[in-house]
Design a protein with these regions (language model features):
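Conserved, well-structured interaction surfaces
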Residues: 87-165, 200-205, 216-227, 398-403, ...
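Flexible, polar/acidic helix-loop-strand segments at domain edges
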Residues: 343-408
Length: 544
């Protein structure tokens, strides 16, 4: 899978390969061949999203090659909030964390480009099998499958646009690609068209693909009830609309778009029936951030069955500091400055180890936790992401963690920001205060950001501080930081970041504008002159 042209065949092959590891295998003895094929295509998409060796580089030892969870870890590594607390020689995400080797010639570009276009082709394959000319003529199964496919495709294009749109920054200039997103591939796209497929305008991708797909998904899933948190639901569609309208609001400085974001965020909260994580659920040493069924907060997540777990190619091996099965421990922790910005009355602070280990009775799945936390883990190391089922010594069990893609808490943050951005600053302050006081403060403590929110800018800075804490490690906030032109800082006196990671970026980071891989520009030469500048090495590490 080196370019879009090759992805159609690859997607078909991947679907067949994945069908064997999908839970609840297709009942071929009672289904028609067409039904089996369609169901296999639909079920193959979420299985592909957690597949290792999805780009083919894992077979060469690239331990970053495990699909969407790896993408989330890559973007998180670019924020400045995540630091490596162990042996940096074993950090497989060092390119993203240190801004090296991110140009078109490097394999890491396949993680986003090849994967997303493979998944888009899989969604297209479902869409082209169902006659969408009249939704009312479809049966319930066809409606749900088509709704899933539209939701998936919208989500994939939304991510691609947010990754690859060139946004102005202080380090690179590319006026010729301003306003451009990515090539659009639809079921009707021919091979000849794919060979001459320029980057579409961002506005067109939103107006002609993302929003129409989400509208279709909303209509098709209006009366559908998802059986579990692993299945696309109407609430997820509303959540994707909230994300998309928030992006449009900022890009266009459009109060109406912000109002739409707030409205859809509230609809997602209502439709999901979800409630934010409790302190007990957040700190659960067995199920913390690894199980869709152990809480009421997840809107949508991905299951990684144990038979599909590879030792070094899963999210848990890189993000859980408690596991014992890896031959190395790069370890991930929080930026020291960000840690000390967390209110001591906020239970989220317990996600990372304080230098004074006796400051809190940290929970763990390990019987030797007290000694292990003191002697084996660095200060500020995270214990947010737990080995599945608490199996810290068995990668087949402990690595088989569910992966969260949307929590209801994100909708509370979108609603608060969008309300303020739309002109109701007092309303945004009230919403953030209510969320934090009701769901994050301990022992009856009250959170009040009023004194920090005299201006809209002040409020957004405070909201983003809380959002960065809330979603640390989950692959959410880089998109917000890019959207809002935020700075990041790992270099300062007392930093806990290794020397090569101490990047201080004023405003939007140049490496948040992802570069299209060379194999694509070779096979689709019209975009060879439309690529984003290579940001590698443009930000020198802070020397002190």
């Amino acid at each position: 899978m080196k370019n879009i042209l090759k992805i159609s065949a690859a997607a078909a092959a991947m679907t067949l390969a994945l069908s064997g590891c999908i839970k609840d295998a297709t009942p071929t003895q009672i289904a028609t061949e067409d039904q089996v094929t369609l169901e296999t295509l639909v079920r193959g998409i979420p299985a592909a999203l957690v597949m290792y060796n999805s780009t083919g580089y894992a077979q060469d030892g690239a331990a970053w090659d495990f699909s969407l969870p790896a993408i989330h870890l890559a973007t998180e590594s670019m924020t400045g909030d995540l630091v490596v607390t162990g042996n940096i020689g074993y950090d497989w995400f060092t390119q993203w964390g240190t801004n090296v080797s991110l140009g078109s010639d490097y394999a890491v570009g396949a993680l986003t480009w090849d994967n997303y276009y493979t998944w888009i082709m899989m969604a297209n394959n479902v869409i082209k099998q169902i006659d969408a000319s009249d939704f009312s003529s479809l049966d319930a199964t066809q409606k749900s499958y088509l709704g899933f496919a539209y939701a998936y495709r919208a989500m994939f294009y939304l991510d691609l646009v947010r990754l690859y749109e060139f946004k102005e920054n202080n380090y690179t200039e590319a006026p010729e690609v301003l306003g451009l997103g990515v090539p659009v591939v639809l079921p009707e796209t021919t091979e000849a068209e794919a060979k001459n497929n320029p980057r579409a305008k961002v506005d067109d991708i939103y107006d002609k693909v993302i929003f129409p797909d989400l509208d279709n998904a909303e209509e098709l899933l209006e009366n559908y009830t998802a059986p579990d948190k692993y299945t696309i639901s109407l609430a997820l569609v509303y959540g994707l609309k909230a994300r998309a309208w928030l992006e449009r609001g900022t890009a266009k400085e459009d109060n109406a778009a912000y109002a739409q974001a707030a409205e859809y965020a509230r609809q997602a909260i209502t439709a999901s029936g979800c409630t934010p994580l409790t302190q007990e659920q957040w700190e659960d040493p067995t199920n913390g951030f690894n199980s869709a069924t152990s809480n009421d907060a997840w809107i949508w997540g991905l299951a990684l069955p144990s038979e599909s777990v590879a030792n070094l190619f899963c999210f848990t091996v890189h993000m859980s500091c408690e596991n014992d099965w890896a031959p190395y421990h790069a370890g991930r922790g929080i930026n020291r400055n960000l840690y000390y910005s967390i209110d001591s009355r906020d239970f989220r602070r317990h996600s990372w180890l304080d230098p004074d280990r006796s400051s809190y009775a940290y929970k763990s799945c390990r019987p030797d936790a007290d000694t292990y936390f003191k002697e084996s883990l660095a200060d500020f190391a995270n214990i947010k992401f737990r080995p599945a089922q608490g199996a810290y010594a068995d990668y087949k069990v402990g690595g088989a963690a569910d992966h969260c893609c949307m929590r209801v808490e994100e909708m509370y943050f979108i609603e608060a920001e969008a309300t303020a951005q739309a002109g109701d600053l007092a309303g945004g302050i009230r919403l953030l205060n209510e969320f934090m006081t009701s769901y994050r403060m301990m022992n009856g403590a009250t959170y009040d950001c009023t004194s920090k929110s005299g201006t809209l800018e002040g409020f957004i800075n405070e909201l983003m501080l809380q959002k960065r804490i809330e979603f640390w490690g989950e692959g959410i906030v880089m998109f917000d930081m890019k959207r809002l032109d935020m700075s990041s800082k790992r270099g300062y006196v007392g930093t806990n970041a290794p020397s090569s990671y101490r990047l201080n970026v004023e405003g939007r980071a140049p490496y948040w504008n992802f570069v299209i891989i060379r194999s694509e520009t070779q096979n689709n030469p019209v975009i060879a002159t439309q690529n984003n500048p290579d940001p590698s090495g443009l930000v020198e590490p802070w020397k002190g």
